[in-house]
Amino acid sequence: MKKLFLASSFADVFDLFLDFAGNIQNKSITFIPTASKVEEVKFYVDDARNAFLQQGAFIDELDLSTASLAEITDKLAKNEMIYVSGGNTFFLLQELTRTGTAQLIQQHIQAGKMYIGESAGAMISAPNIDYVKYMDSLDQAPMLRDFTALNLVDFYVVPHYTNFPFVEAAQKIIDTYSTTLPLQPIDNHQAILVNNETKIIRGNHKG
């Protein structure tokens, strides 16, 4: 049972998440803000954290760039959901790969644990993130040699479609890859709900 909630701006679609996930009071969430660690703008991490807390969920923060493998393994195993924040997708993949977390997350998702991905956390669910180079800087991930990502879905999320300040970047991705990759653009008020192999787009496009 594979269950994913993929969004551009999690706080803006939190109601859609609750419709999808149900009551999250007392649910424990492995909260991974790693992608934001190399970004100057990171308000979205606090917004997501606060949204969970206001519904009575427990946040168990996990920064892959500093955590040990034992800590990573323990937190992913004991908590009920996995949330991966926005930020730099290449830095996120570098740390997922370096720590071995990518394989652990794949195993937990295949076993039925819910995955929640916001922006970079949504794009990392694709088979490969080479297409993200028009939105994120590779300079933040000097150790990254392979763009193979989590491969949780068979499509490629393009977040923030028509939303400032990513209008040009999102359109460049679409112009470049629309004929070669199964892209799925979503704006800040839309989300992709995945149940096994079924994909549903929720929310109204407001571009």
Swiss-Prot record:
GO terms for molecular function: serine-type peptidase activity. Its EC number is 3.4.21.-. Pfam families: Peptidase_S51. Transmembrane segments: none annotated. The active site is at S119 (charge relay system), H160 (charge relay system). One of its GO terms (biological process) is proteolysis. InterPro entries: Class_I_gatase-like (IPR029062), Peptidase_S51 (IPR005320). Keywords: Hydrolase, Protease, Serine protease. PANTHER family: ALPHA-ASPARTYL DIPEPTIDASE (PTHR20842:SF0), PROTEASE S51 ALPHA-ASPARTYL DIPEPTIDASE (PTHR20842). Belongs to the peptidase S51 family. This is Uncharacterized peptidase PM1590. It comes from Pasteurella multocida (strain Pm70). The lineage of its organism: Bacteria, Pseudomonadati, Pseudomonadota, Gammaproteobacteria, Pasteurellales.
